[in-house]
């Protein structure tokens, strides 16, 4: 990449760094088999993710008090378990299932690419996940973050400006010294509005057969890469 380079690179996490869909489907399918609970776990995972943005929007609009993503995930799970007619789950079971979001697996290029980038840049997630979720995920997946920027540090979810600008403030950097990396064009558009640099790489299988967008960059982002390892190469890491 010619020209200016960032001091820090922050990454969207769900879908960008980790494969939430395949991870949860595999874990819940194994859980159901072990417990002899028959359910359409794939459909449940897709419905659970579909509840993600609407639940956060209720918080962002002030329709409900600040709630961590763990809390929002749990409220959505409770509703879906009832809707899917899944019986026999204890509170311990429900908590275990909800914490599946803490045990997501990385895409194959994520850890190698981040390890390279870490040698040259400050790296961390800028995610709607809470700090404990992202910390546990990093431990599970071996993700080598320098710092974890969870939504509960800011009391805001993306795309609120407080998230993007909050990273720069915490790192004592100007927004233009921070790069937002994501597999979602809308995330990058919101980051760019706040003055951040941007990097895009596609995750065309994030939503499985339900993927409808983000197959390619839809703007001239500062960097367009194949994946995180290619991002590292383009940034000279």
Regions found by a protein language model. Name each.
Residues 1-9, 111, 115, 126-237:
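Asp-based, Mg2+/Mn2+-dependent phosphohydrolase catalytic module
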Residues 3-108:
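N-terminal helical cap/lid subdomain that shapes the substrate entry/recognition surface
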Residues 14, 61-63, 97-99, 119, ...:
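A short, structure-level motif marking secondary-structure boundaries and short turns
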Residues 31, 35, 113-121:
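A short, Lys/Arg-enriched amphipathic alpha-helix followed by its capping loop at the start of a domain
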Residues 36-39, 85-88, 121, 125, ...:
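Secondary-structure boundary/capping signal
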Residues 49, 102, 115-118, 236:
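Alpha-helix boundary recognition
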Residues 65-66, 101-102, 123, 152-153, ...:
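A generic structural signal for short
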Residues 107, 119-122, 196:
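Short phosphate-binding/catalytic loops that engage adenosine nucleotides
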